[in-house]
Structure formats: structure tokens, C-alpha cells
């Protein structure tokens, strides 16, 4: 489990106006994506049905991802009192859902799915490390640091399970590279677009939905 909780954050130390509008918009968007982890838990639970070890791990992963979303969302509400995290999350979920009713990974195999998950976790760890290093807002810096560490831990989690599957269901290097490149290219997909819209556009123009 993650080594921190929301109660440990000094929310009174948030400095509204200490971040520019662009970074604030990015954090709001990230909050929605992180908070939507339950859909991915459902998807991965179906893909890895029967693998009790992985299913247990992914439940914990989902709880930690949702905590990331809750922390970022609460910070965003304090930094921008006009932001309604719950309303934005509801709008995001109304507009975007991943398919959970599957029996096989969209990557073609469980091994391929774990390659893709490693790409995601390394990218998000770097993303939050960059936020931590770029901001002077004290609470966001702490939260981003916690999340960056968690995401690296999640990368290691998926790497361990990848090694287990690679030993019994190996993927050729070329296939692994293709999966990684494909997932990397999806970094600007519909999920981020909808999250940005729900967090930053819709609250200012409710009729745009």
C-alpha cells in the first residue's frame, strides 16, 4: 500500500494563485483520470481472471490511483474555489468510459497488457516528478512527489508480473516494442481529451456538452 494518506496532507498550507492557469488546468485533468481507476480495475480483472495474485494486487493499485485523484481534486478545489471536482468527475464519466466487458487484453495477450501498463506507469511517474520540480506551491509539490513515488512503485509491480508471464507466455522483442510504441502514441487519446473538457471547458460553458 501507499505510504501516505489524505489526512497527512496539510491542506491549510495551500496557496491559491501560486500556480499559473496552465498548470492548474493540467492538475484538474489529471485528477479526473486518476480518479477513474475503477474502470481499469474492472478491465484488468477480466483480462487476468483466474490469476488471484494479480487480482489482489490490482485492487490495491486501484485504491491508490483513486487516492491520487482525490488528492489532486481536493488541491484543485482549494487552489480554485470555483472548481467542483465531483461534478467534473461525473461529467467525465458520463462522456468517457473504457470497455470492461472483455475476456482478452486489447494488446493481444496478458504479457502485452503488462508491457503497456509499464509504459503508462513510467510515463506518469515522470509526469508527476516534473510537476513536483516545476511548482513552488508547497502542497502540490508534496502531493506530486507522493504520486510520482507511487507510480514508480506501480511500474515495479507490473514489471514483476510481466516477468512472471514472460517466462510462461513470452512475447518476442519486436512485439513488445510494438505494444510499447502503440501505448506511448495513445498518450493523447480520447480519455485525456474528455478529462480536459470536463475539468476545464464544461464548467465555463455548460451548454458545450
Predicted features, each with a name:
Residues 1-209:
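Non-heme di-metal
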Amino acid at each position: 500500500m501507499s505510504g501516505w494518506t489524505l489526512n497527512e496532507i496539510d491542506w491549510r498550507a495551500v496557496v491559491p494563485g501560486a500556480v499559473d492557469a496552465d498548470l492548474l488546468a493540467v492538475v484538474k485533468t489529471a485528477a479526473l483520470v486518476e480518479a477513474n481507476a475503477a474502470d481499469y480495475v474492472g478491465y484488468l480483472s477480466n483480462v487476468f481472471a483466474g490469476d488471484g495474485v494479480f487480482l489482489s494486487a490490482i485492487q490495491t493499485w486501484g485504491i491508490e490511483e483513486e487516492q491520487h485523484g482525490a488528492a489532486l481534486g481536493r488541491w484543485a478545489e482549494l487552489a480554485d474555489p470555483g472548481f467542483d471536482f465531483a461534478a467534473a468527475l461525473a461529467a467525465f464519466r458520463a462522456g468517457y468510459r473504457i470497455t470492461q466487458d472483455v475476456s482478452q487484453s486489447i494488446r493481444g495477450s496478458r504479457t502485452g497488457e503488462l508491457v503497456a501498463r509499464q509504459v503508462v506507469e513510467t510515463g506518469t511517474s515522470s509526469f508527476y516528478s516534473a510537476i513536483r520540480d516545476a511548482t513552488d506551491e508547497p502542497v502540490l509539490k508534496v502531493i506530486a512527489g507522493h504520486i510520482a513515488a507511487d507510480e514508480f512503485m506501480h511500474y515495479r509491480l507490473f514489471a514483476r508480473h510481466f516477468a512472471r508471464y514472460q517466462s510462461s507466455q513470452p512475447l518476442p522483442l519486436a512485439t513488445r516494442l510494438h505494444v510499447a510504441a502503440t501505448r506511448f502514441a495513445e498518450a493523447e487519446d480520447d480519455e485525456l481529451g474528455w478529462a480536459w473538457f470536463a475539468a476545464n471547458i464544461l464548467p465555463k460553458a455548460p451548454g458545450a456538452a
